[in-house]
């Protein structure tokens, strides 16, 4: 069950921009877009991004240092994310696969490493490329 979060004004503005972008956005691109809506300081953007990541509304694509809207509501409660990233067009797709989650959970149990979250990124070429 997805937990409902009350977003602040800044969080809502930033989430809407990321969600409508259709792909990953870097923090300074977000700042450029939100300045027209009254958010002027980078710190305001970073605080909102941190909170949106924390509650699972967006994800950070570590290899691109960019943010993307969550495409799968179940990861908002599991803290487990995986992405396929096209090396040519840079299209990013969120992977929601219960078998992958189960495998990583078993791996964690067998290795003795208890993870608090994971963010996997797989690279290759998409069907279009």
Say what each PLM segment does.
Residues 24-34:
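Short acidic, hydrophobic short linear motifs in intrinsically disordered regions
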Residues 53-61:
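A short, conserved structural fragment
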Residues 46-50:
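Short, hydrophobic-biased segments on the C-terminal half of alpha helices
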Residues 13-21, 33, 55:
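Short amphipathic alpha-helical elements of helix-turn-helix/winged-helix folds
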Residues 36-40:
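Short, basic interhelical loop/turn and adjoining N-cap
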Residues 1-16:
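Short alpha-helical segments that sit at the start of domains
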Residues 60, 64, 68-129:
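Non-DNA-binding regulatory cores of transcription-related proteins
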Residues 43:
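Key DNA-contact positions within bacterial/archaeal DNA-binding proteins
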């Amino acid at each position: 069950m997805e937990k409902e979060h009350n977003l602040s004004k800044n969080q809502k503005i930033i989430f809407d921009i990321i969600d409508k972008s259709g792909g990953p956005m870097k923090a300074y691109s977000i700042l450029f877009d939100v300045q027209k809506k009254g958010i002027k300081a980078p710190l305001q953007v970073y605080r909102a991004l941190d909170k949106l990541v924390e509650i699972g509304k967006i994800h950070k694509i570590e290899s691109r240092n960019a943010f993307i809207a969550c495409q799968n509501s179940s990861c908002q409660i599991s803290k487990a994310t995986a992405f396929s990233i096209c090396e040519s067009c840079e299209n990013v797709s969120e992977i929601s696969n219960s078998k992958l989650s189960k495998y990583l959970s078993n791996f964690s149990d067998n290795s003795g490493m208890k993870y608090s979250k994971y963010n996997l990124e797989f690279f290759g070429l998409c069907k279009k490329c």
